[in-house]
Amino acid sequence: MPEAHGAAQMPRIETFHSRSMADLQPLWRCEQPNGHLGPARQHPWGALHRPDWDARGLVIWPRGGLWRQLQLQLVCPPDWQALAHQSGALDEVGLGITARLALRWWADQVELWVDGARVHRGDLFDTACRWRLPASWWQGVPLELELCLRSPLHDDGALISSAVVLEPLDPEDPLGLLDETKLALQDLRAGSPGPEGHFHVLGHAHLDLAWLWPVADTWQAAERTFGSALDLMERFPDFHFGHSTPALFAWLERNRPDLFARIQRAVAGGRFEPINGPWVESDCVLISSASLLRQFQEGQAFSRRVFPGLDHRLAWLPDTFGFGAGFPAIAQATGVDWFCTHKLFWNATNPFPHRLFRWRSRCGRELKALMTAPIGTDADPVAMERYRLEWTAASGCPEALWLPGVGDHGGGPTAEMFEQLQLWQGQAEAAPQVHGLLRDYLARLEPHQEHLPVWRDELYLELHRGCATSRPDQKRHNRTLERLLREADLAAVLAGCPAQQPGCSAQQPGEATDWRVLLFQQFHDILPGTSIPEVFEQAEPQWRLARRSACRHRDLALHHWLGSRPAGGDAPLWWACQLQPLAASRQVLRLPAGSWTWNGQRLATQPASAGGGWVQLPPLAGVAALPLVRQQTMADEPAAIEHPVRLERLAGPDGAAGSDRVMDRWRLGNGLVALELGPEGVEQLWDANGVPQLAAPLAWQRYRDAGEFWDAWDLAADYAEHPLAWGWDGDIQWAEQGPLCTSFVRRGRCGSSAVRLEGRLRAASPWLELVLSVDWRARHELLRLEIPLQQLAQRWAADTTGGVIERPAQAITPREQARWEVPAISWMASVPKSGGLAVLLDGPQGVSATPGRLGVSLLRSPTWPDPGADNGWQRLRLALLPCTSDWQRAQVPQQAVRFREPLWLRPAQPFSAPQDWGEAVPALPPLGDGLLLLALRPDSTQNDGLIAVQNSSPLRRHLRLGDGWEVIAELDGLDQVLQDHQSQAQNLPISLELRPWQIRFWRIRKR
């Protein structure tokens, strides 16, 4: 370690400007460009590159993980020594005053060394210290300080403030050391000598499961944080601590049982408060309604099991990046009635107008909502009072919540924080403090409920608009695993076997269809793609293992349900199974080569360019299975093709329509949708009535996307002003032509990235499928599809977590204008005066809309915190669906399900007695217009099914399960009985009503 400079080289400590505080910023020394030590504040780099920070008195150095070593010899001035003798600070009792070294920094690693010994460590999250100076310093012994700081990779580093602060040990403060702060408190209240309200104080430690550290670090941070909190409870009798995230408690229960037992005892004693809710602090705009429901079901079930003495009516999500409009419906159905967040204070444009309000979903369910105090705070009395005044002015409530504790990477409250709280507890100028549980605080807010404003919209975060597009691999993993888990649950119900039997869904952790792997990866810094590379590298094998387990579990259950093929049969029997209760439709699939028959009827086939053949299946309605027989020889004449694809050449030089290149313009259609191809690609699209959809050709565009501090989180607001080149190589080529499937291919380059676009139209399909494959090699670029609309949209709709939301196409208000990019989970649709155009997505994407345009953000390439984010081979799949009526009558939500959830196709199992394999095997009828199946899973205690259905339309709908099922009881979202159903005793089909946008739950049983 370099030696500290001598006292003669530094400004005299007597230059301190206050009796109670000495500013150290001018006194630090560092190596200058000439290699000599000099004042750190005078280093030329800061004034040149960060004049804004330099003007604030910060010590600054460059970003990129660079270290800066600061040195200072700290000497107690004679007048302070005299003050200490006067106060008795040097006697054995230790009464009088104390001195603390108060530091604040912006650095990702910090070490404070005093006389060669390290006394404190910090980082980007533990950003301050108040180290108590030893008694020897008061006696004139200088302290050699060395402060080692490393700048963040993404931002310049700074020592924000440094000072020695004197504090009285006697609450009476006979020396007036607190006078300056007391005057500041009075100034905040415009001269009022005393406060009219008080604080409710709860220690807290926000703990991200992964972010700038891998998950393994989180377990260690949780262990340290909870152990520290329990130790502080023994030292400070008033100390109460609250923490969320059942996933963390579950890890402690399994891996640190002794610590978890201490937590349970502290919970029983009313000092440690689990403020849980969902399984993790998940993203709430990129996950489906089914996943959000399961988040709450798993979290609530765990909380009720391990903390049985508490009511669990709280969703604590302080840091999640916005919330879908349907969130209240799902949360309230699972026993939650309070919702707390802080993130909307991050709005970059329009401050959120409420601190305390009622948040109502479109179905009428609502939550009481609290915008909490900041997280990661300390016990600074001025900051506390400033917040309390803002809270009281905004809410009308005199009692403000305060949450001291180091956050993000854990840590929680420190002893220094509570010593400072105790110091100010007895000061008349400071607001009184009440230490207690969050539940008690919320209970005292309950009387305000009737007078609270009602918010009937999504909670859109005006920031972090790039999260829906960054790291598409995580969105793809999430979509696939969720589908497999839902299918495994449904298959277990169809198989009719207990939850613990192989091939059926399990409800306990560690079983094959344990949802908790998926739920954990939906954490709000993993699924959005805003973590370091190690997080995603370590998640990859977990994704793969969970997919394989869920797939195996589903297949076993489906084979158990369907039985086996006839013994001794010559032709292989296959099953084509639809696992969503959708309306009847004929689908075209690519199957292994051969002649395929159903019920003795040969099915229409067409050779496929990628191998095998295209086959049009008979209509499948609801959840059902078709038995298909594969033969090597041709049977009788095939069945007629429904809505065959026809290709027509419109103009151009000599050449047949069957040539392998498109030389001019071609028209492609199947009676449900038609398109025109030309030199500019897809130049027009028509619906079934021949209404044109495009005002100009589809535009695949590339932009510069740079300059944002939160790189992986934020789209550049000015990206449209910085277009980049995109070139197509040659003409469009036909990949295959035929009545069942016709597809074209176009290749090109955008910068260093090779691009392949495939368009595909199948018989009887109402949409044009587009698949963009990209070898993405970019930095700070954005890839988008822009769709110019022929019919101007008045509004536009998209699905969101918990439901559907419609927005005005023409943004008028500042809040509407701020929503220039929003997340969509699986579809968006324009809403003109009649008809419209829908875009079906294969997973969450960032989307946008104006009256004349729909847009989809496809790929980004941020460099922080993951330098290689998004780069590599990417496959993006979407479809264009013209609507002859609005999106509701066109059943766009159901079409989106059909688009992204393929049929299950497997050979039948052998070794069985003969059965009748002619007709389809029905399981669950189509739910009906506007209804979506969220879940059908086995009951863990009975041989029943638990079904959750959502009405995705603004009209009342009726669910009819048909003769094969009886309804046992209506449930809430936690499987508790709300109402027994008696009408099933009459052996008649039951019609179950769902109000607009409503979610309902039932226990059902196969007849």
Q: For each of these PLM feature ranges, what is it?
A:
Residues 81-116, 575-579, 589-590:
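Aromatic-lined ligand-binding clefts that engage carbohydrates, nucleic acids, or primary amines
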Residues 206-212, 217, 365-565, 834-908:
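Catalytic grooves of carbohydrate-active enzymes
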Residues 284-305, 372-392, 742:
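Alpha-helical scaffold elements lining the catalytic groove of polysaccharide deacetylases
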Residues 104, 109-161:
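Beta-strand-rich ligand-recognition modules
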Residues 2-36, 40, 162-200, 482-594, ...:
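Histidine-centered catalytic/metal-binding microenvironments
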Residues 189-201, 221-236, 251-311, 322-333, ...:
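Catalytic alpha-helical scaffold of carbohydrate-active enzymes acting on polysaccharides/glycoconjugates
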Residues 1-80, 86-88, 283, 524, ...:
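Extended carbohydrate-recognition surfaces in non-catalytic/accessory domains of CAZymes
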Residues 327-330, 346, 355-356, 371, ...:
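C-terminal (or distal) subdomains of carbohydrate-active enzymes
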